[in-house]
Amino acid sequence: METLITISRWLAKQHVVTWCVQQEGELWCANAFYLFDAQKVAFYILTEEKTRHAQMSGPQAAVAGTVNGQPKTVALIRGVQFKGEIRRLEGEESDLARKAYNHRFPVARMLSAPVWEIRLDEIKFTDNTLGFGKKMIWLRDSGTEQA
């Protein structure tokens, strides 16, 4: 549990996620501001259905991605690599996520894009501030944590 707490604290301080989808052998990546839900271990994003990545995702799809800072030295590198699933939210689930998203990013109130959830199933957190190449791994299904 400590690994997930450490990762969640770091993710809560960031705000841009990159994720990639695949359809029929074609890959595409996208970036978006996110709201991280530590309880569900999920990102919430807004993206229009007409975008290439949303079209490739359909109502849900497997994804992989990253969240990282932009440090000037290797010793300060910190970042997450993940795999999981993206899905478009509907109804009350969408309304609740949008309310929380709009609270974090008030400018989003002007947007009508649908809300999507990226559920994280595996996370690898690299934190060179704890020593070069220091990794922490969290897996949803097994509850496994490695430091």
Swiss-Prot record:
Gene3D superfamilies: Electron Transport, Fmn-binding Protein, Chain A (2.30.110.10). Belongs to the UPF0306 family. NCBIfam families: PRK03467.1 (NF002900). This is UPF0306 protein YhbP. It comes from Shigella boydii serotype 4 (strain Sb227). The gene is yhbP.
